[in-house]
Each structure stands twice: as C-alpha cells, then as structure tokens.
C-alpha cells in the first residue's frame, strides 16, 4: 500500500511539472514567430484555444486530485457522500443550465458568463481548501501544490474569459457576489467532518471544472462548425 502511495505521489509530481511547463505564463501568448505578446493582441481564435487549453488542464488536475484524495483519506464506506455532495455544491443556486438540452439552447453570451461565474465562485473556496489541507498530518505536498496551481490557473482563466467577453460580445461583465458561497467554510469542523467537507469541495469543483471545459468547447464549435455542435 505504501508503495502504491509513493507511486501516486511521483505521478503527481510529473503531472504538475508538465502543467507548469505548458501554462507557466497563461496570458502571455506566442505569435507565429515565437515572440511573447499580450493575449489582448492575439486573434480571437487563438485566445479561445488558449482558454480551452487552460480549462482542459484544470479539469484534468481536479479529476486526478479528487481521486488521489479519495484513495488516501476517504474510506470506501463513506464514498457515497459524493452523491450528496453533488446536491450541495456552492454553485448549485447559480442560474447555469445543467442538462445537455438546456446547454445546447443558451446563447454565446450566457456560455461565457456562466463560465465566468463558475471560475470566480471557486477561487476563494480553493484558497480556503489550501489552508484546511495544510492541517492534514499526512497530506502529501503534491496535493497542496496542486490546489495552489489550480487556484492560480483559475485566476488566469478568469482573465482570459474576461478578454473573450470583450472581444466576442463587446460588453462589460455581470457582477457576481461570492460572499454567500463562502459562509459554509467559516466553521472549523472535526477531523471526519473536515475530510468529508474537503472531499465534497473537490468533487463539486471537478464537476464544475468539467462544465467550464464543455461550455468553452461548445462555444468554439459554434464559431467553427455550426452544423454539428453536440455535447457528448
């Protein structure tokens, strides 16, 4: 068992090293000659590709981290809490479509603003998650580093989405109040409760990270292949 955990940690180190290398400077984009330029200066197509790349990696890291946390801290008998967590996610009350048919019908404007709401709503909870994970006696550094990495990349993704809204919609932003989403994180829970809560946070974030990726890919499809844009 210990050997398996060591291998898991090594795999995480390799994954994070690759992610840092790929997206070290998320809003600095290379032109055709390889020179670094501001993302505000690149084409809409390249900016959208860059944002999608961010969303893909964020989802991948969130999926792996959720699995690793589950294997290390959550007993099999308690993993059914994941289903309950999906019903109590901090973004559940947001006016964001959930079914495939609803998502297909919403406008480009709401696709972008939905992604922005999701991104902004998760930055502070993930910062808090870093603090709670730091109190775990046997939490590997890779989990802590991963949480910090995702938080930083969410901030970068937020900047990219804001720029996409300006380029594609030529308008300002919708105001989102995050305070109501943070109230449940104010109490210091007992150990088991803390594990289940952190597990719920990771599970909910993984779900929302996947939704961000799906929305952005649907948006790109609408602008490149309008006749065959379906959500799998």
From Swiss-Prot:
The keyword Acetylation does not apply. Keywords: Disulfide bond, Glycoprotein, Hormone, Secreted, Signal. It comes from the Eukaryota. Glycans are attached at residue 145. One of its GO terms (cellular component) is extracellular space. Residues 1-24 form the signal peptide. One of its GO terms (molecular function) is growth hormone receptor binding. Pfam families: Hormone_1. InterPro entries: 4_helix_cytokine-like_core (IPR009079), Somatotropin/Prolactin (IPR001400), Somatotropin_CS (IPR018116). Disulfide bonds join 29-39, 89-204, 221-229. It is found in: Secreted. Belongs to the somatotropin/prolactin family. This is Somatolactin.
